[in-house]
């Protein structure tokens, strides 16, 4: 049914717990996974040295998050393409990458919490749900 899953992550603990869920779903579907981490742009207010240091730190963190997903996928025998992008609007980058990579499903974390906050959905997840034409599977 699904052949190419986009799995965007911000590396937060709330999205880390769904890595195995996403990879398991992909394995059952016989799908490949594109793991995506969207990094913020660095502000022009930084000096050039600060901007470069910020970018290096963001890339390093992205590669760490993506390697964790890639390791779980490799261990499960699921093809995984790690990718990072830069955007001030993560949902926009998610939609763009989903289209560019011809993904047919987006899997995201709800970032739900306990109590009233648990009933709310992450704003980036909500924006993806609102603006995409693709199916979105949201894990809690």
PLM segments and residue spans:
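Short glycine-rich, flexible loops that bind phosphorylated cofactors or substrates
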Residues: 14, 90, 114-116
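Structural beta-alpha unit
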Residues: 71-106
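Short, well-ordered secondary-structure micro-motifs
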Residues: 18, 45-48, 92-95, 118-120
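Hydrophobic anchor at the start of a short beta-strand
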Residues: 33, 80-82, 136
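A short acidic, glycine-rich active-site loop
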Residues: 52-64
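Gly/Ser-rich helix-loop-strand patches that form or flank binding pockets
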Residues: 24, 96-140
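Structural motif
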Residues: 36, 83-85, 139
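Small/aliphatic-rich secondary-structure junction motif
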Residues: 3-49, 72-76
